């Protein structure tokens, strides 16, 4: 598997128009979810830093509330973080979420999408997920990306992008 991060570094460009890296990760409820299972549907793949934090909760709830609208447009929603499957399951129950959440505990998929970044807080640096969303078409091509996402109106912006396909 190639890393999108390698493409970005070597060509100094974004990843739009490239094939999506293969995504196959443990999911809530058990088992493995592979994005290829959804073809020929579009996929909105959203990466978020941590379950049960205020901004991540707002984002996941917003996507869940818009799920039916995305489904009408032949589009599936999938969330990814480094949290465990058990954490995802608690997060889903507590917030009545209805989208699958994948556990990338080793950050391999986060690295492949170049969302695993150095961050800093209170003078300390650490590695973490940069909130990002990718729109992947039914052929597995990345057709739009949102980086350093601010959640206000984000779901609406993603929905508009899907409508424009």
Put a short name on every predicted segment.
Residues 2-165:
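Chalcogenol-based redox active-site neighborhoods
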């Amino acid at each position: 598997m190639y890393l999108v991060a390698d493409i970005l570094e070597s060509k100094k460009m974004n990843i739009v128009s490239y094939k999506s890296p293969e995504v196959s990760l443990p999911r809530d409820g058990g088992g493995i979810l592979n994005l290829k299972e959804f073809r020929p549907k579009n996929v909105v793949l959203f990466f978020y830093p941590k379950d049960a934090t205020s901004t991540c909760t707002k984002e996941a709830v917003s996507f869940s509330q818009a799920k039916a609208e995305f489904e009408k447009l032949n589009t599936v929603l999938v969330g990814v973080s480094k949290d465990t499957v058990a954490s995802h399951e608690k997060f889903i129950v507590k917030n009545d979420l209805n989208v699958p959440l994948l556990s990338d505990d080793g950050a391999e998929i986060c690295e492949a999408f170049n969302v695993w970044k150095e961050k800093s807080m209170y003078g300390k640096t650490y590695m973490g997920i940069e909130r990002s969303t990718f729109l992947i078409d039914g052929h597995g091509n990345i057709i739009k990306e949102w980086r350093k996402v601010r959640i206000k109106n984000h779901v609406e912006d993603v929905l508009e992008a899907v409508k424009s396909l």
